[in-house]
Amino acid sequence: MSDYKHTLNLPETEFPMRGDLAKREPNMLKRWYDQDLYGAIRRAKAGKPSFILHDGPPYANGSIHIGHSVNKILKDVIIKSKGLSGFDSPYVPGWDCHGLPIELKVEGMVGKPGEKVSAAEFRAECRKYAKTQIEAQKTDFIRLGVLGDWEHPYLTMDFGTEANIIRSMAKIVENGHLHKGSKPVHWCTDCGSALAEAEVEYYDKNSPSIDVRFKAVDEATVAAKFDCPEGHLGKGPISAVIWTTTPWTLPANRAIAMHADLDYALVQVEGEHPERLILAAELVKDVMDRAGIEKFHNLGYTKGVALELLRFNHPFYSFDVPVVLGDHVTLDAGTGAVHTAPGHGQEDFVVGQKYGLEVANPVGSNGVYLPDTELFAGQHVFKANAAVVEVLTERGALLHHMVFNHSYPHCWRHKTPIIFRATPQWFISMEQKGLRQRALEEIERIEKDGITQHGQSGWVPAWGKNRIQAMVENRPDWCISRQRTWGVPISLFVHKETQQLHPESVRLMHEVAKRVEQSGIQAWWDLDKAELLGSDADMYDKVPDTLDVWFDSGSTHSSVVDARPEFNGHSADLYLEGSDQHRGWFMSSLMIGVAMKDKAPYNQVLTHGFTVDGQGRKMSKSIGNVVSPQDVMNKLGADILRLWVASTDYTGEMTVSDEILKRSADAYRRIRNTARFLLANLNGFNPATDMVAAADMVVVDRWAVGRAKAAQAEIVTAFEEYNFHGVTQKLMQFCSIEMGSFYLDVIKDRQYTAKADSLARRSCQTALYHIAQAMVRWMAPIMSFTADEIWALLPGERSEFVFTEEWYDGLFGLDAGEQMDDAFWAEILTVRGEVNKALEAARGEKRIGGSLQAELTLFAKPELAERLNALADELRFVLLTSKAKVVTADTAPEGSVATERADLWLSVAQSAAAKCDRCWHHVEDVGTIAGHEEICGRCATNVEGDGETRQFA
C-alpha cells in the first residue's frame, strides 16, 4: 500500500493556534520600540491630509483603571484606522499635572507648604511626585498597544506648557471676558478651596428640614395686601414662612424670595396661640400637615408681586429683610417662600444682585463661622445646624423641624459635603462679552458641520449635543481662581487701593510667561514686582491665586495643539472622553476656545460610557468587582481587552466581567483560527510569481475575494462612523459565516489535493492572499499585536509594519450579470444549508458517517436545476459530497426529503463506491488505475499527470 501523504499540500505555518498573548505581546512591543514603529508611521504618512485626535489628559495620580483603558484603546483604534484611511494622524498623549489630588498626596509625605517645607520646596516635590505617577501610567498605556509619541508627551507642568497656559489666560483678559467678584462658589472646607463644577459629586445626605417664621415688621400693611373680607383680617402675629435644609445659612439671610405670579394665602392658625402665616396657596395643606396644625383657614389671597419689598424681621438678628421676587421659586417643595442668602447660593446671589442685597459671608475657608458671627462664632457650619435650630426654637421662630434625606453636593476628592460660599474670586463671564451665546452657536455649528461632512452629528452619540447645550445654558460664570500652591499662577497685578487690574496686564502676563518658560511656575513667586512694574511696584499686589486645573487642560488646544510642530497649525478634529466630560474637559475647552478664538477647539466630540460589572454595578473595591486592566493583560493579553472594548457599544454603559472577557477570548480564537488557515494555506505561495489574474481564477475564488471587498466597504465605513462594534460584528461574520462555514470548507479538497503549482491551487492561494492582505488591515486598529504577527508571516514583499499601510486596494469581485454572480452564489449557499441539514439527519440515523460517504440527489424545479447544473461535476465539491446529481422535478419525488425551499427536495444515500486513500472521496474508479490502485483517477492526475482542471469550485 502506497503512502500518498507526501503528495498532499498540507497546511504549514509558524503562526501558532494559541495566541499566548500575555507572554508574546511584550516581545512585540520591544520590537516596535526598538525599530521606532511610531516614527515609521509618521514618515510613511508625511504629507497626507491631517487628522488630529487631541488627547484629553488623564490626571497624573494613581494606577490606570479599566475606564482609562477603554479611553486610550478607543483613541488608538481611531488613530490607526485613520492612518489606514490615508491620513497623517499623530497622537501626542498628555497628562494633567497640577491641582489638589497631588497636593494632598505630597502633604501626606512632606507636610503642608509653609510648615515643614517652603512653598517652593512643596512645588518641587509635587513636580517630582507627578513624574513618578506619569511613568507608571505610561508603562501601562504602552502595554495596551497604544501607539503615540510616548517619548515626548505633553505635560501641563512642562515649563513651556505652563507658559502657554498663562498666554491663553492673557488672551482671555485681552478679549474682555475676565472679571473679579465676590460670588458664591462650590467650596470644600477640607480642601480650603473653590471647586470646579466637574469636581462636584452628588450623594444622599441627611439634613435638617425646617420651616421658619419671619415676623412682619408692619402687620397692618402686610394684611392689607390680601383680599380678606372687610373686618376679617384675622388675629395674631403675621409671619412669612420659609423652608430650608441648610439652617447654617440663616445668619447670612438677607431676603425672602417669592414668585411674582404665584398665589399666596394669609392663613389663620386657630387655637390658644393664634397666628397668621403667609404661604403659597397650593402648599398650605402640606405645610399644615407636617407642622401638625389641624385648625386653620385661609383669610385671603394675593399674588406674590403685591408683597414685593415688604419687610420682615430676621428670626434671630436685630434687622429686617425684604421680600424679593425670583423665577427660581417653585411649588415643588417647601412653602413658596425661599430663604435667600446671596453669599451661599447661586440663585440667591443672582436675585440679590438685582435688588442690591448684601453678599454676606460669615463663614471662613475652613467652614467655621468667623469670630464676629453673632451667636455662632467658632462653630463649624455643619455642626452648627443643631445650634441654629435651638436658637430658632428659643425665639419662637421654628414652625417645624424634621430630618430630610436628599441628594447633596460633595467634594470629589474628600467625599465630604461642600458648601456654597461667597469669596473674592476671578471669573470668566458668561455674559459680558456674549460668551454663552457664542458657545451655544458653536455647539449648533458642530452638529451641522458633522452632518454635512460625515453624515452624522458632530456630537457622537447625538444626545451629547443636548447635554452640553443644557449645561452651557444654565451654567454660572466660571470661577477660575483657586487658593492653592501647586498650580499655574493667574499672573495678575491688582492696585492695592482700587483693586483694579494693572492697565498693561496683557503685556505683563506675556512677560511672566517668558520667565515661566525658562524656569517653571516658581518664577512667578520668585518674581520681584519691581522687575516688571518699576516705580509702580509699591502700588500693586501680585495675585496669589492659581488657575483652576480645568483651565490647564481646557487650554491645551492652544498651549499644546497650536504649539506642537507635528500638528502643523491644524486644530483638533476630534475630542474623545467619558460622558462625565461634558461638564469637564469638553466644557472648559469650549469656553476657553470661544473666549480666545471665537471658535470651539474641536470639530467632533465622541463620548463613551462608564464601565460597570456584569450586573450593571459600578466598579468598587469594597464590592470586589473591579476588573483590573493589568490583570487582564497578564492573563489574556492586551488584544483580548482591545477586542472587548471594540465589540462593546460605547454609547452606553460598558459591561465587563471575567465571563464577558472569556467570550471576547472565544471570539478572538475564531478570528485567529481563520487567519491561521489563510497563512497555513499560503505555504509555498510567492505572489510575485504565483499570482493568478482575476480573469483566470476559479469562479468561487473570485466570489470569495468579492465578499472580502464587500466586507471591507462595510468595515471602512464603520470605522469612519466610529461604529467599532459594527466592525467586529462584520469581521466575525466574515470569518465564521462567509469564510469558515463555506469558502474555507469548500477549498480544502482543492487546496490539499490539487497539483502544487496547478492553476486550480494557485487560484485558491491567490484568493487567500488577497483576503489575508485585506483582513490583516481590518484587524490592525483593534487586535494590533495579532495583526502585526500575521503581517510578519504573509508571503511576498511588504513594508515592515502593517500600521504604515492603507486599506488594501487589490480586491475585486464577480461582475454583475455574469452567470455565476453574487446572487448565484447566495442561492448556492441556501441550497448548501438545506443539504447540510439533510446530511446531518442521515448521520443521526447512522446511514452515513462523514459527508463524503454520501451520494446526494437534488430534485429541483427547472429554474433551480438549471442553475445547479451550471456547476456540472463541481457541484459535489461545493456540497462536500462524493456525488451530487441534479434531477429536474416539479413535485416531491417518492422517498425524497422536503426542504425549506419550495423548489428543492433531497435524497441522501450511502455511496457503494470505494474510498480514495488520498482525497477520501468515494469514487467508482478507485482500484482501476494501474500503479495507483488505492486512489481515484482525479488524484492520479494530480499526482502524476498535468493536474485536474477546475472552473467553478
Swiss-Prot record:
Assigned GO CC terms: cytosol
EC number assigned by the record: 6.1.1.5
Catalytic activity: tRNA(Ile) + L-isoleucine + ATP = L-isoleucyl-tRNA(Ile) + AMP + diphosphate
Domain of life: Bacteria
Residue ranges annotated as motif 'KMSKS' region: 618-622
NCBIfam families reported for this sequence: ileS
Protein name from the UniProt record: Isoleucine--tRNA ligase
Origin species: Aeromonas salmonicida (strain A449)
